[in-house]
A protein has these predicted regions:
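Surface-exposed interaction regions that form or flank ligand-binding interfaces
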Residues: 1-60, 67-72, 78-88, 93-197
């Protein structure tokens, strides 16, 4: 485990409440990976600088990069209202709907294209590494103490699939163990350099 879950939020410009919620979501994701034994199987990097196509760091970071023996996962974590709710996407906005009443909960959230930019940038910058690794990008809607919401076929801009924590853990559990090959060492060094410090 490289970096610190939630560290990138300290300089994000979000208000204190949003920072605390975001940090809680990232810490809970790390705990879920630990509980499933995935931190021993896979290599994780927390609060990774995103790059633009000119190789410059941009403000938005990647919450977590996870590397298996065959896949690099770029993961964005969302800690929104949950429980007995359904998440729906419409015109770039994420709506939270109460399952029992069908009423909308709170204001819709604008769905950022950051992960689409991250996928494009990393595909471009690390094309040589991606001859040996697949690149997968996910937005994970984390459960709160009220439980997990249900996703109604939600995609973030750039067709980035949104999944529940359970779905993400299931995908990761089917991955090969990280291998400390030359390629694996290159990935570790590269993402280590991109950690927010």
């Amino acid at each position: 485990m490289f970096g610190e879950p939630g560290k990138g939020l300290n300089k994000s410009g979000f208000d204190e409440s949003a920072v605390n919620l975001g940090q809680e979501g990232e810490i809970n994701f790390a705990k879920a990976l630990q509980k499933k034994g995935l931190l021993e199987k896979l290599v994780t990097f927390w609060s990774v600088h995103n790059l633009n196509l000119e190789d410059e760091r941009v403000d938005a970071d990647i919450d977590c990069v996870i590397v298996s023996g065959s896949t690099i996962w770029l993961v964005d974590l969302k800690f929104y209202a949950s429980g007995n709710v359904i998440y729906r996407e419409e015109n770039g906005l994420l709506y939270t709907i109460d399952s029992a009443t069908g009423a909308q909960i709170g204001r819709p959230k604008k769905m950022s294209p950051n992960m689409s930019y991250a996928e494009e940038s990393f595909s471009h910058k690390f094309a040589n590494l991606l001859k040996y690794y697949r690149l997968e990008t996910r937005v994970v809607l984390m459960p709160t103490y009220k439980g997990a919401g249900r996703l109604d076929n939600v995609f973030w801009p750039g067709q980035i699939k949104a999944v529940s924590l359970e779905e993400m853990l299931d995908e990761l559990s089917r991955e090969d163990k990280f291998r400390d090959t030359i390629g694996g060492q290159m990935i570790r060094q590269t993402f280590n350099l991109l950690l927010k410090r």
